[in-house]
């Protein structure tokens, strides 16, 4: 029983009313290692799909791959684009609403496609990497296409969580905390998105290219230059998923850790932290008198300045964010002269 993930609750204090997030703590779960290896194999498959989608984009100017790695990846994608209209959406029930039969059906097609394109029988996985291979190896786990489907079905059919003295089986969705959970969600949404763009392109190429400025980071979706996107949401994704429009201003949106403003089509970027909007104070940087070494604590300041510099389009935005950070760290015991020494390293 100790090997069954323990479910615990985290409040979303910034929501009104206060929201909930349930996590399955699977650190000691009996399928932990299998799920970890499966996660690496899924990432390899997703990378194959990314490379394939890049080729499609180069040849036909169609965006099959909306997934981004981080905010810098997203900025590289859109910073030189002229965008007058922006929207952001949130998949509020992504993990809890994914239908198991839908996952199995879509993944069966994806696995077959990828293995056939690669022309290799195996995905060899160890703790460091995963790769396609013509033969299995003794020092790693070797997965055929049939093995991948068996693992997927086993993982989905054996999701149990422990709550107090009771054990529950999850029959819809996947738990947050499962190693391969994020990869399963990402790959499933990718299958919906790519299939829809491909389908539309055969009927209306101009409309299909309207999706070129769509980007998604797991359950956060950005849509640029496509005012009618909302008409397509439930043609792309199943209605089991609850998808909410987050933005209320087409000229200024917050996405990931970015605030994006459209000024006559040109994009202006600055740093956004949703925790700044909380009605209560939080501690997200170390105190100088904590157990953290002084050098490491000052390194946090330096790394944040680099992040601000990479994101901010205008010097004024960088200065405002840096000034706020300095004031916060001073309240937490940092000396101004130490911060200034670190700041000089940027020049």
Predicted regions and their residues:
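Short, compositionally biased low-complexity segments
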Residues: 5-17, 79-83, 123, 157-164, ...
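Conserved polymerase palm-domain catalytic core
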Residues: 72-235, 239, 248-255, 263
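Short helix/loop capping segments that flank catalytic or ligand/cofactor-binding pockets
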Residues: 18-21, 32-34, 46-47, 96-99, ...
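Non-catalytic, regulatory and substrate/membrane-recognition segments associated with hydrolase enzymes
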Residues: 1-85, 92-93, 108-112
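A broad, low-specificity signal marking well-ordered, structured residues that form hydrophobic/aromatic
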Residues: 7-8, 21, 86-87, 253-254, ...
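Active-site and adjacent loop segments of nucleotide-processing enzymes
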Residues: 170-175, 179-183, 190, 194, ...
């Amino acid at each position: 029983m100790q090997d069954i993930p323990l479910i615990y609750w985290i409040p979303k204090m910034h929501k009104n009313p206060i929201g909930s997030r349930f996590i399955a703590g699977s650190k000691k779960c009996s399928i932990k290692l299998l799920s970890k290896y499966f996660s690496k194999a899924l990432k390899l498959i997703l990378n194959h799909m990314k490379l394939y989608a890049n080729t499609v984009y180069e040849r036909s100017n169609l965006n099959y791959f909306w997934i981004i790695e981080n905010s810098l990846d997203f900025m590289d994608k859109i910073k030189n684009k002229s965008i007058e209209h922006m929207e952001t959406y949130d998949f509020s029930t992504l993990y809890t609403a994914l239908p198991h039969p839908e996952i199995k059906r879509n993944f069966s097609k994806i696995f077959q496609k990828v293995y056939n394109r690669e022309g290799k029988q195996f995905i060899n996985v160890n703790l460091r990497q995963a790769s396609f291979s013509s033969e299995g190896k003794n020092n790693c786990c070797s997965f055929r296409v049939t093995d991948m489907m068996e693992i997927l079905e086993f993982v989905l059919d054996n999701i149990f969580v422990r709550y107090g003295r009771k054990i529950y089986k999850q029959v819809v969705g996947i738990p947050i905390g499962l190693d391969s959970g994020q990869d399963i969600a990402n790959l499933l949404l990718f299958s919906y998105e790519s299939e829809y763009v491909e389908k539309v392109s055969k009927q209306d190429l101009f409309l299909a290219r309207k999706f070129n400025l769509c980007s998604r980071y797991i359950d956060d979706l950005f849509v640029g230059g496509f005012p009618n996107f909302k008409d397509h949401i439930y043609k792309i994704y199943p209605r089991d998923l609850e998808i909410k429009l987050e933005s209320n201003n087409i000229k200024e949106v917050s996405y990931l850790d970015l605030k994006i403003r459209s000024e006559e089509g040109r994009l202006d970027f600055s740093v956004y932290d949703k925790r700044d909007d909380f009605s209560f104070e939080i501690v997200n940087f170390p105190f100088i008198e904590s157990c953290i070494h002084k050098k490491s604590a000052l390194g946090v300041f330096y790394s944040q300045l680099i992040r601000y510099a990479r994101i901010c389009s205008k010097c004024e935005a960088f200065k405002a964010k840096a000034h706020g950070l300095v004031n916060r760290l001073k309240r937490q015991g940092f000396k101004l002269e130490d911060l200034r020494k670190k700041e000089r390293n940027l020049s």
